[in-house]
């Protein structure tokens, strides 16, 4: 989702170093120091305007959250939500999330969220899908043994592809939801996309996969 450039976005991000980590390369292997505790660290790749990551941080104060997005203006809106939520257990990264080993040491994070990632439906773009095996290689490195990926999408094709990709990689599927909002799953925090699609009656798919 491309968002129109927001005037003052850079200044807003720079004015809130308690939430926005600008020296991200120096943060590698030091995230627990930045949070000031040893609580688990959960990362959302492609956090958009921040509804999910800020909502999760508010819902789970004993877990540290990191939201990543490549778009500066989008991340500034995520910062708005973080400030509104009044939470301290969250950091935001304005970076390209294609290689998370640039920002995280091996085993440094405890869970990864992939929400409504670009489906890249054309076969020639398969390697760009975040559930493609080369991305799974990267995710496995930064997660601990038995680390989990929690994945949500409205795109059935991407969901089916991801189930196969996880399984072929040798991952264990701990939970599969073919219609999340019609299930008894508790504690779901919606993204902006999820709210939009749900309002249109679209089915939301979810899976928890463990390395």
Swiss-Prot record:
S-adenosyl-L-methionine binds at residues 44, 69, 96, 118. Substrate binds at residues 122, 154, 191-194. Keywords: Methyltransferase, S-adenosyl-L-methionine, Transferase, tRNA processing. Pfam families: Methyltransf_4. Catalyzes the formation of N(7)-methylguanine at position 46 (m7G46) in tRNA. Belongs to the class I-like SAM-binding methyltransferase superfamily. TrmB family. This is tRNA (guanine-N(7)-)-methyltransferase.
